[in-house]
Amino acid sequence: MIKKISDAIGKYMALIVLAVAALALFVPSTCLWIQTSWINYLLMLVMFGMGLTLQLNDFVMVFRRPKDVLLGCAAQFTIMPLLAFCLGKLFRLDDALLAGVILVGTCPGGTASNVITYLSKGDVALSVGMTSVNTLLAPFLTPAITYLLLSTTVSVDVAAMFISIVKVVIVPIGLGFVINKIWGKYTQKVAEGLPIISVTAITLIVAAVVSHNAQRIMETGAVVFVIVILHNLLGYLAGYLLGVLLKLPVPKKKALSIEIGMQNSGLATSLAGSAFPNLAMATVPGAIFSVWHNISGAILANFLRRVE
């Protein structure tokens, strides 16, 4: 029964998140009870769930095909930050929105990318390998790249960002991984209900950010939506074209496209709140990306699965 509910929620995740985001935007009073201070804890819950699904075999891929994984990771932390920076400057965003967009770009790949790669008939092993390594590199690369791109605009506390990523991402994933390693036969049963927990947590994060910034989103939202959509779609395109340039097999092209285009926008939202507490609107791009990339990911999977 739980698995059926989880499957249904996972299938309609994009619609659920979109509906809640719309409610929070147009009737913010319905979601103001969800505090923005909960965001870190909700993201920790999602990351813990990700850890429960990881196994040693997921990391074996890194050692068997290090070139593929490292190439993908290098592309991830180069293409998306530069796209974010260029789009932010092109649209002349204010400091808060620029910080938020760049944080989306400098964060690692999204946790849903593995599922989208599977649905696209892409190289799932490469996708999982990239997600795992990108996430482990995030405490070092996300603050460093953010500092390089933003230091002349706003103050960036690199040490605070490092600590926040370790606390919110690495520790929960590591704890989940260890528990899965020790009590695997029990965690497999728990894993059936993880989509329910993850979707609920992500939905609450989006609702909190949107409802508490509804007025400002209504004033500047159109520009942010355009940038988020362009950032995501250009990321997909750049990832696929990189695969074409390197003459990779089609499944690898699909994995690269999805891994590069989809970002851990929940982490971007969390970091925006902790790293830039005086820039409230910095949390908005991550929240909008959370809504959009679930929609675009589903559409892309439906398209790419037909590409042979």
Give the positions of each predicted feature.
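Alpha-helical transmembrane segments of multi-pass small-molecule/ion transporters
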Residues: 1-308
